[in-house]
Design a protein with these regions (language model features):
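Short beta-strand and beta-hairpin "edge-sheet" elements
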Residues: 20-22, 75-109, 348-383
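Surface-exposed cap/loop segments at beta↔alpha junctions
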Residues: 63-166
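Short beta-strand-centered interaction patches in the first periplasmic/extracellular domains
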Residues: 95-115, 164-256
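Short, surface-exposed beta-strand/loop "edge" segments at domain boundaries and coil↔beta transitions
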Residues: 11-15, 56-61, 84-89, 113-119, ...
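Short, ordered beta-strand-loop transition motifs
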Residues: 10-11, 21, 28-47, 95-104, ...
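Short, flexible N-terminal segments of the mature chain
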Residues: 18-35, 279-289
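Polar/acidic, low-complexity leader/linker segments enriched in S/T/G and N/D
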Residues: 1-27
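An acidic/polar, Gly/Ser/Thr-rich interaction patch typically located in mid-to-C-terminal regions
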Residues: 38-66, 239-390
Length: 390
């Protein structure tokens, strides 16, 4: 069954259970969200905030109730409890809160949202002529871990319950962050850019119980050799007419992008540019029409970084793709429990009898999972090369 508790944002210390009558949640590789639904049991129509009746909030006095849900200081943990074990799934800090006589409504800021208000500037180094933060000879996930540390533990009052991992893992990468460029140094933005370069690793935060009274988050990243986050075991799910461990499966299809125009730093005719293209699909006997994209990367004057971002975009969009989505019921013992399967994990999907997906086993990587406080969970997977076009 699902359980929700309040906690302290800085330490992750659990406080008390809180009863939110109706809520929906979602997890992706890099982010998480939780919100109340307008109609209990409806899979559609999420509100932008969580609404809690005062009868569900601990406290006998106005001060106690207000402090239990202090914006910024307090958070919410959603997890799954089964056989006496609680597995946290979603962690977030209480954001802007609005109270009425009957209830209180607030947003829930995920870790990425919190890090969007932190900047990768060394403490005491935001002065004229300050030297940059230079990180070199490291793996991309080690650079990301250092970026996170400087934006949290490296600042007064900056602590968050995050285990950043290995700061010193060797690699061939380097990054330089100048204080004067602070407008482009939001920690969340920097982490996104590390993940989005060609060969960039998956970066994710996964909550866990550090002890019976504290929740923490592990910062996990793929290695330079394998960009995907590791997993303990790979589950097998099945779809076929009338049975199987998953249902309501759909497959979306998308054609290829053959060209990406990328612009970098500079102005007008001096602006740095890079063209990434592969016109193979346009030159087939049965050709695809040309599809182009444009992008901008102005955070650095390093042309190789601009090229890396452009080639990474082309590599992800060039193939004719399809994307699988399905639902599963947690009441089915064949379905992995919350906390056993995470976005970023690989899953083997065994298909038989789907109209446009040939029979066989497909190794898919989970991109997003979502649900409400019931037992139905929706899974969306990374796009894969369309087997009908391969």
């Amino acid at each position: 069954m699902w359980r929700m508790l309040t906690c302290d944002t800085v330490t992750g210390e659990l406080r008390r259970p809180i009863d939110i009558p109706s809520a929906s949640w979602s997890l992706s590789v890099s982010d998480a969200s939780l919100s109340t639904t307008r109609d209990k049991g409806a899979g559609e129509g999420e509100a932008s905030s969580i609404t809690v009746p005062w009868t569900s909030v601990w406290g006998r006095t106005a001060r106690e109730r207000a402090r239990e849900l202090t914006a910024g200081k307090r958070g919410i943990v959603l997890g799954w409890e089964e056989a006496g074990e609680f597995r946290p799934l979603v962690f977030g800090a209480i954001g802007q809160r609005t109270d009425t006589a009957l209830d209180t409504s607030f947003s829930l800021d995920s870790v990425q949202a919190l890090l969007s208000s932190r900047y990768v500037v060394r403490e005491g180094q935001f002065v004229k002529g300050a030297q940059p933060l230079s990180l070199s000879g490291l793996s991309l996930r080690a650079i990301a871990a250092n970026v996170g540390w400087y934006a949290t533990e490296g600042k007064p009052g900056g602590s968050l319950p995050i285990d950043w991992g290995d700061f010193y893992e060797k690699g061939s990468h380097e990054r330089t962050y100048w204080p004067y460029n602070v407008g482009n140094l939001s920690c969340a933005d920097v982490l996104d850019k590390i993940a989005n370069v060609i060969g960039g690793p998956d970066l994710t935060f996964r909550p866990y119980m550090a002890d019976a009274h504290h929740v923490r988050l592990r910062f996990l990243g793929g290695s330079d050799a394998d960009v995907y986050v590791g997993q303990e075991r790979e589950c097998v799910l099945q779809w076929f007419h009338g049975a199987g461990s998953v249902h309501s499966m759909s497959v979306a299809h998308l054609g290829p992008v053959e060209r990406v125009y990328a612009t970098g730093s500079g102005s007008e005719e001096e602006k740095d540019v890079h063209l990434a293209e592969d016109l193979t699909y346009c030159r087939q006997a049965d050709p695809w029409p040309l599809v182009e994209e444009s992008m901008s990367y102005t955070d650095s004057d390093d042309h190789s970084l601009l090229a890396s971002h452009a080639e990474g975009r082309l590599h992800s969009d060039w193939w004719p793709m399809c994307q699988v989505t399905f639902e599963a019921d947690l009441g089915d013992p064949q379905v992995p429990r919350p906390g056993e399967l995470w976005p970023g994990d690989a899953v083997t999907l065994r298909v038989e009898g789907f109209p446009t997906l040939p029979d066989g086993d497909y190794r898919l990587r989970l991109m997003e999972m979502s649900g409400d406080l019931g037992t139905t969970v929706k899974y969306k997977f990374d796009p894969m090369i369309d087997p009908a076009e391969a």
